Amino acid sequence: VSTTPAGGSAGAPAPPAWDAVLFDLDDTLLDLRSAQHAAFDATVRRQWAGAADVDPAVLAEATEAFASDTGGHYGRYVSGELTFEEQRLARVADALRTLGVPEDAATPLDGLWTTDYEEVVRGHWALFPATADVLAEVRGTGRGVGMVTNNVETYQRGKADALGLEWVEVLIGSDTAGAPKPDPAPFLAGCSRLGTDPGRTLMVGDSLRHDVEGARSAGLVPVWMSPDAPAHRGVAEPLWDEEHACWRMRAIGGLRTWLAA
């Protein structure tokens, strides 16, 4: 992947002029993956006592299968094919197969993985480092801040509030604008609520398909949050990714280099 400092070549655009930023929530502002890992590890031991004796590498593989949703069940939820609870149970079933759970314990226990797991994972919700500070700094420049997320608005509103983001009033869920990301509708709804032009609005997210491609199709400025993004001279500033035609940065702190833009 070719990444270039802003203005570093004829193909790299100058840093964008922007009036507002929309963020994805899960795995962009919230470290959901870590919370899912911790909650799965705790809950699977209640599903099957033998989990305590499984090879740690196998347990890690099963945990990642659940968190990364290797079966694509969350997408079926977003499209309306599954309920939220059904997609979670399907992900658990995949993970239990990976774990090698015996047949008599391989059916996910409904209440355990819905009510109980939900309580555990909420206890592990946390923002990525520097997130709260960077959001406050963006707001301090007078720019708008909002969220566009692929889960229902009420659930994500409660999540954001629990993370101390109740002041972020603009939150567009998968059910808010009539279609989920990557459809242009939720991005444009976010811009409308913020009162900003899409071409002067950043969209920061971790998904190339849902966040980057969706934002681009809606006319926003896409910024890909990618932990393995290269840094220019040790600085985690956003770099232009020529292959994907978007800006790319390792962590939210990279936005600080654009606060004066």
Model-based region annotation:
Residues 37-45, 85-93, 97, 153:
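An amphipathic alpha-helix signature
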Residues 30-34, 53, 104, 122, ...:
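Residues in soluble alpha-helical coiled-coils and helical-bundle/repeat scaffolds
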Residues 2-68:
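Active-site neighborhood of HAD-like aspartate-dependent phosphohydrolases
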Residues 65-116:
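A metal-dependent, Asp-based hydrolase signature
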Residues 48-55, 98-105, 164-167, 195-196:
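Short helix-capping segments at alpha-helix termini
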Residues 17, 81, 85-86, 106-108, ...:
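Short, acidic loop-to-helix structural element flanking the phosphoryl-transfer center
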